[in-house]
């Protein structure tokens, strides 16, 4: 239930190579190094091309390279921020006879290919880097095909227009970017661009049913066949314990879950309360367990002798309506022990500021969501009437449901763009 972001890690990913397109995205310690992937894709391109030169192989291709580099230089209206210096330098060299010697052609050729392939990638799937992502798949072969098999007579501008995202919210953001934002307003620009890149990601990873839990909005939505079926408020991680961005799948739902309190919460928050109030454990339905999961008689423990550093036990909260996880837990695959869950503290959903959890996502309408995902196996009456120590049950979903825990600092309502507070300071 707790997640601590590595403060040394960058909030945005660095350039793939010194000449690759940059964008606004978030880092992921679980992603393969981008430089290695880009080198591999470029090499794959030349293997398929059967020629060590592509752009310098003919005047036609040189002209095409100039078109691409011009597009990359001026792609700000698409929310794709490029390394203009590299693009300009190569383009000027291309149109200036004799400025590229034979030995440099191979290097320049690959630089152009890397720039163009990365542009095609960002254009169609965005450059969002979730902290953990098991949904997105490689489309490198598609981008290579698009570059090698351009339609006869189709300009680069026409190709980009054809491949550009057609998502409704994306188009609203794109038009807003074009019409409303001054280049000098870098914060708003970054927020809109981040929103555009998320919409590109969703379009590239289209799913029938899915959940989006957006951290800055502290809201979650469930979509079925692209129709919004449930929208609810959430409580997400605090600034101290931020919720990570995750693209994963809900695999099962637990009814009447136990809460195995993370050790850091146990020693920093619960232990002082137990030492101060002798009946705290009983009043809040906690058991003390050892490392093997065996329940310990807490009345025989010398509580005053324990500190954060030497407390050898764990706390486990019994099932029931007063459990911190409520009566439902939605498990999703990720390395951070993050999940969605109900809660016994409903009052938090009435607040505007809902960045209060240790990292997990509390749902305002968990019963409705569970009923949608497991219509024949969820009895809302039983869940509402559950008592202390009700038996916990894990129910596998017939098919896993994608869930995207996102950091989108803008919201689209109709044709209006709403800017959200950058609660974790990731946009800067």
Enumerate the predicted regions with their spans.
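Cationic-aromatic interfacial patches
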Residues: 32-136
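Conserved catalytic/binding loops enriched for acidic/polar residues
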Residues: 141
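Well-ordered beta-sheet/strand-loop patches within structured domains
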Residues: 2, 30-38, 43-47, 114-118, ...
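Bacterial Sec-dependent N-terminal signal peptides
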Residues: 1-35
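Generic alpha-helical secondary structure signal
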Residues: 7, 16-17, 49-50, 81, ...
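A generic structural signal for solvent-exposed, polar alpha-helical segments
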Residues: 9, 18-19, 61, 74, ...
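Alpha-helical structural elements
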Residues: 7-8, 25, 50, 63, ...
């Amino acid at each position: 239930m707790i997640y601590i972001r590595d403060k040394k890690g960058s909030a945005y990913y660095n350039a793939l190579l010194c000449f690759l397109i940059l964008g606004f995205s978030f880092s992921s310690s679980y992603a393969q190094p981008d430089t290695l992937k880009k080198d591999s894709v470029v090499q794959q391109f030349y293997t398929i091309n059967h020629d060590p030169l592509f752009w310098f192989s003919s005047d036609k291709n040189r002209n095409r390279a100039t078109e691409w580099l011009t597009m990359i230089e001026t792609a700000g209206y698409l929310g794709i921020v490029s390394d203009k210096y590299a693009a300009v330098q190569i383009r000027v060299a291309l149109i200036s006879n004799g400025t590229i010697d034979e030995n440099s052609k191979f290097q320049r050729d690959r630089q152009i290919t890397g720039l163009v392939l990365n542009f095609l990638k960002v254009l169609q799937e965005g450059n969002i880097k979730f902290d953990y992502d098991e949904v997105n798949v490689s489309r490198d072969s598609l981008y290579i095909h698009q570059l090698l098999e351009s339609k006869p007579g189709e300009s680069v501008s026409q190709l980009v227009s054809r491949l550009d995202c057609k998502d409704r919210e994306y188009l609203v953001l794109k038009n807003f970017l074009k019409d409303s934002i001054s280049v000098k307003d870098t914060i708003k620009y970054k927020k809109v661009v981040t929103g555009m890149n998320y919409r590109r990601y969703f379009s590239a990873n289209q799913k029938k049913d899915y959940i989006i839990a957006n951290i800055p909005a502290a809201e979650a939505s469930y979509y079925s066949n692209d129709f919004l079926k449930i929208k609810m408020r959430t409580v997400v991680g605090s600034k101290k314990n931020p919720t990570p961005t995750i693209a994963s799948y809900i695999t099962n739902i637990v009814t009447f879950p136990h809460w195995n309190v993370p050790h850091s919460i146990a020693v920093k928050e619960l232990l002082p309360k137990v030492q101060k109030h002798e009946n705290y454990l009983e009043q809040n339905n906690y058991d003390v367990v050892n490392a093997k999961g065996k329940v310990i008689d807490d009345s025989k423990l010398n509580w005053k002798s324990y500190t954060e550093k030497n407390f050898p036990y764990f706390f486990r909260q019994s099932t029931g309506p007063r459990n911190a996880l409520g009566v439902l837990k939605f498990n999703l695959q990720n390395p951070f022990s993050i999940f969605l869950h109900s809660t016994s503290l409903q009052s938090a959903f009435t607040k505007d500021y809902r960045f209060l959890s240790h990292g997990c996502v509390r749902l305002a309408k968990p019963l409705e969501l569970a009923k949608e995902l497991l219509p024949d196996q969820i009895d809302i009456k039983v869940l509402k009437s559950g008592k202390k120590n009700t038996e916990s049950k894990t129910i596998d979903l017939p098919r896993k449901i994608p869930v995207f825990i996102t950091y989108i600092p803008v919201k689209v309502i109709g044709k209006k763009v709403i800017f959200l507070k950058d609660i974790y300071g990731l946009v800067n």
